[in-house]
Amino acid sequence: MSKKYDAGVKEYRDTYWTPEYVPLDTDLLACFKCTGQEGVPREEVAAAVAAESSTGTWSTVWSELLTDLEFYKGRCYRIEDVPGDPEAFYAFIAYPLDLFEEGSITNVLTSLVGNVFGFKALRHLRLEDIRFPIAFIKTCGGPPNGIVVERDRLNKYGRPLLGCTIKPKLGLSGKNYGRVVYECLRGGLDLTKDDENINSQPFQRWRERFEFVAEAVKLAQRETGEVKGHYLNCTANTPEELYERAEFAKELDMPIIMHDYITGGFTANTGLANWCRKNGMLLHIHRAMHAVIDRHPKHGIHFRVLAKCLRLSGGDQLHTGTVVGKLEGDRQTTLGYIDNLRESFVPEDRSRGNFFDQDWGSMPGVFAVASGGIHVWHMPALLAIFGDDSCLQFGGGTHGHPWGSAAGAAANRVALEACVKARNAGREIEKESRDILMEAAKHSPELAIALETWKEIKFEFDTVDKLDVQG
């Protein structure tokens, strides 16, 4: 060895705290919210995160002399206060692109949120945002189809897609499940959906469900003259079973399948997205288990990161919460990660939780899916928040209609078209929501009953995970 090797332990900040560093366009940038143990300097905590998520370990090792750590190491180049939290701070870290396998979200997350989250010097650690360089994005497959192609496949333009989750989500036989699908689609919905936890249980094996659903979709298409679909959940306990289910959906000439991307894993999701791209299949993505990871405001991974990772891994639709329904998520935060699903360039905007400029290049966009505790009274707000490139899914807000699922579907369709018409006429649909819906209900008894049924239903709970912005 030509260089002198000094054995022992040295402080992380001696190597990984580099405030003079100017990030390169090819660097992957990450923002962590850090809360260190009492008495540990911020610079040491931040440098430890940079080290343990890149090339570092707890001790100096002789094999460092066999490579160029200055080239490969992560660098903490900036520290910022967290508004309203004197114990926490933001650490901005730059990683050279060569640390990551091309196109592998699995590898990126293994590095950034691997062992470092169990580090004793930290009380809490949260990955708030990632700036993926365009050089990495170009190695990812991304959405197998994207918004434009999906609209062309479904022949739906000028409005959000309208759907619902089949309820009860567990317990129905395959035949009865297919009957509910048919009622919803003939009533006016574009799409129906398996819930995240319907796979292949004793009361309803997956092949039986697929066959009855396909029959229902095709019958509804013939009767309405519209393209219909159902998200067939292909999530399975093995990759082989996953692809067997996808292949059978293709044999049945179904337009769209579904995957639970967090419980299923990014490796499985990327593989399924590649299969969908090759086989002309749309891919709906559910985010089951996300709140375990993203809801704590000080520890875990923010959903904006999980949403960005999904766009790169591959999916044509992704659940994002509703703002107005039963699930966590404030308006500005939700708009922030919806932007990162759909836009080609998203500027840094702390008011929406975006810590970096994000250039997506020519990667197709992803439909934002609003689902969870929504009903017809929410329709104007949903249209205003999510816009046209979204899918609005009313589960209980369809099946809970006193006249049944078909009437619930009809009510939602009338409400949506009334709101789109009002918006296109220049009306302020959120401010005039009651007038717009009541006018439409004069010509739709289904909508009138729905408005009466859910007039008192609200989910007015404060958001747990709030944006860290200066008040």
Swiss-Prot record:
UniProt gene name: cbbL
Any one GO CC term of the record: carboxysome
Key words of the record: Bacterial microcompartment, Calvin cycle, Carbon dioxide fixation, Carboxysome, Lyase, Magnesium, Metal-binding, Monooxygenase, Oxidoreductase, Photorespiration, Photosynthesis
Name of the protein in its database record: Ribulose bisphosphate carboxylase large chain
GO molecular function ontology, one term from the record: ribulose-bisphosphate carboxylase activity
Residues the entry annotates as binding Mg(2+): 193, 195-196
Note, other: The basic functional RuBisCO is composed of a large chain homodimer in a 'head-to-tail' conformation. In form I RuBisCO this homodimer is arranged in a barrel-like tetramer with the small subunits forming a tetrameric 'cap' on each end of the 'barrel'.
Cofactor binding description: Binds 1 Mg(2+) ion per subunit.
Protein purpose: RuBisCO catalyzes two reactions: the carboxylation of D-ribulose 1,5-bisphosphate, the primary event in carbon dioxide fixation, as well as the oxidative fragmentation of the pentose substrate in the photorespiration process. Both reactions occur simultaneously and in competition at the same active site.
Native organism: Prochlorococcus marinus (strain MIT 9301)
